[in-house]
């Protein structure tokens, strides 16, 4: 099966065999082979050869191609949404919104490109001080499995608009979505070599990340893999590296008047996408006392009634399967480990069907437990009770991560205090943690990434500034510097 796209041609991989099944029922979806190191090299060389003409084409012409890609996405929205839903296990309604977001990224990227990396000029005596931006050249995009369309698209679109050529290495858990997406790029008329697709797992990733022909790498995924890439790129200031990674995100709840409103926002924060968003709440901080007891009881009641099902089930489920049986096994083990460390199960996460990756939401009180500073990437929420807001902030900040944090409170004063004292790239007030504006930068600090590689500021990583002093004519200065005689 032809699963690679190199120099405008679909090719069979020479690497290890790959297969993808639906995580909800193990139905076969896709087969192919990974790219070998030689094929990765061929993809990078083709991208390098295609880069000069693509960069010289000009933004207006490049934008026409990218807009045609957007038109193909719109035409095939239903088809691509079904691919994403089957491959990830997420409900069809959610996969459909993912494709819609991919289309919307085009106009946002054009606006960001103009604002963040456009051209500026100012008079400077008899000359002009001009700021322009140039593309890096060949960049790799490493995509994640949780949003296999939207998240790599968030790097590919601005990178192409800026004039780069791109090598796309998707997660080995979502090869089908990547293949279908690249087909749309080819249909849109992207010149041969400007985008390449190399499938594969670790070996493919190592070959691509270590290739001398790369000018940059944009990564979305786990903190462990991101840290390895950061180490690999150390001492290489000639290469741009963007890292968007995970988080052990805290959400602080105060004694709000609208209890069900807060419960809803916690549900959306912790369990949307089966808890497989990097901004999902992992630690819920609830005040001690009767109000907190009642709030937790209501949360457990609502979470226990959430509909879990296959992507196309009717009525539609709120959450579907996690990405794989291995992921489900790891989450169930994490739940057991938290209990063994002193946690109290409030709502036990369980597997709905043996051999399938559909999990019900889990909630564990870990107030008295030894809590590992890890991201449990799934529908598993820890509840931690706090005595006062000082303690809440201390607990919230007790993490090496720094992606998202938030406060559900009727007090603006408490939110302002948390905003000031928190260390995170996304800080929300009375909104789910998983909510973010496409017109804002996205990313984290600490173990969550190197600042803002995604969303509106992605443009910053796709081109570098060039400062120029320009004068239409050459003339001898009226006054010479001391020591010069002409």
Swiss-Prot record:
Pfam family, one: Aldedh
Pathway: Amino-acid degradation; L-arginine degradation via AST pathway; L-glutamate and succinate from L-arginine: step 4/5
SUPFAM superfamilies given in the database record: ALDH-like (SSF53720)
Cysteines engaged in disulfide bonds, as pairs: none
Catalysed reactions, as listed in the record: N-succinyl-L-glutamate 5-semialdehyde + NAD(+) + H2O = N-succinyl-L-glutamate + NADH + 2 H(+)
Superkingdom, natural source: Bacteria
Annotated protein name in UniProt: N-succinylglutamate 5-semialdehyde dehydrogenase
Source organism: Chromobacterium violaceum (strain ATCC 12472 / DSM 30191 / JCM 1249 / CCUG 213 / NBRC 12614 / NCIMB 9131 / NCTC 9757 / MK)
